[in-house]
Amino acid sequence: MGEHEYENLWEYFKPSAQLEHAIKQLSIDAYCAVRGTGYGRIDIRMDKATGKMYVLEVNSQCGLSEDENHTSIGAMVRLGNEKFSDMLGAIIENALQTKLKYIKAAKFINK
């Protein structure tokens, strides 16, 4: 292996509908527990033997690269059959809507 290469110690797969629902709920619960806002990534690992899932971290500063060798987002988007550009657009739209709410609230308070 080269200086900046590593072996993936995990695998990405398209979950069943039931598992996808459980992952989404666990992610929402973890994000709400830390009062997350905006874009973030919830790192979860699942014990293959038991099926139990564990939240490793809520990452609010995760990378945004389509290249699966640099960040996991590329694999997630690919497995979700989404376009990377659509995901970025949704992140930007959410950030703008959030900022607009703060601006409107500040104008109301300063009247």
Feature locations, PLM:
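A long amphipathic alpha-helix within ATP-dependent nucleotide-binding catalytic cores
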Residues: M1-K48, K99, I103-A106
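C-terminal active-site "lid" helix and adjoining low-complexity regulatory extension at the edge
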Residues: K14, K48, K52-K111
